[in-house]
Amino acid sequence: MKFDKSKLPSRYVSIGVKSAPHRSMYHAMGLKNEDIEKPFVGVATTWNEAAPCNITLSRQAQSAKKGVKNAGGTPREFTTITVTDGIAMGHAGMKASLISREVIADSVELTMRGHCYDALVGLAG
């Protein structure tokens, strides 16, 4: 299936002569021309080994990526930080909890904008 990417953010990194350097980076990561021609869908997780609520997110992201591929998109997985209240509470770490939510939102937005992804699947613990 051929997609019209002319109005999608990923057009800046996938269409035309100006995006040749960008496409070379995608090819270096193993993407084929067919993958680059599809919408790019960011799959963001807060996977880490800090708490049980995040430990399975890497596996869940693999399932989400399969779903994106089956729906005709090209998944691009990335992670962000997390501060788990269950561990951060009751000591100085509790000051990091609320601030971490802004950092998470900012880092996901910056990745989406910086890499011109067209859509997002977000997974958090």
Please place each PLM-identified region on the residue numbering:
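Metallocofactor- and cofactor-centric catalytic cores in central/energy metabolism, strongly enriched
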Residues: 1-125
